[in-house]
């Protein structure tokens, strides 16, 4: 299992946008993104650093593996 990087919520969103996620709506300190095909809905907190457990839960909801996510960051 690959080790998750420590990244900000905004960097997480930029990476998820590469997989087809688009802005649904900003909601205070959280940002909601949605992908139509295959359908997925994620809520990402706008924090400077996301906890690894939070990032893992976001990736699970997005249907993206840790390895795919790390490859998209690079």
How would you label these PLM feature ranges?
Residues 1-74:
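Basic nucleic-acid-binding interfaces
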């Amino acid at each position: 299992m690959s080790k998750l990087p420590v990244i900000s919520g905004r960097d997480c969103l930029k990476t998820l946008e590469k997989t087809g996620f688009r802005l649904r709506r900003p909601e205070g300190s959280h940002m909601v993104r949605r992908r139509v095909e295959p359908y997925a809905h994620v809520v990402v907190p706008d924090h400077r650093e996301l906890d690894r457990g939070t990032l893992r839960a976001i990736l699970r909801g997005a249907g993206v593996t840790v390895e795919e996510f790390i490859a998209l960051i690079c």
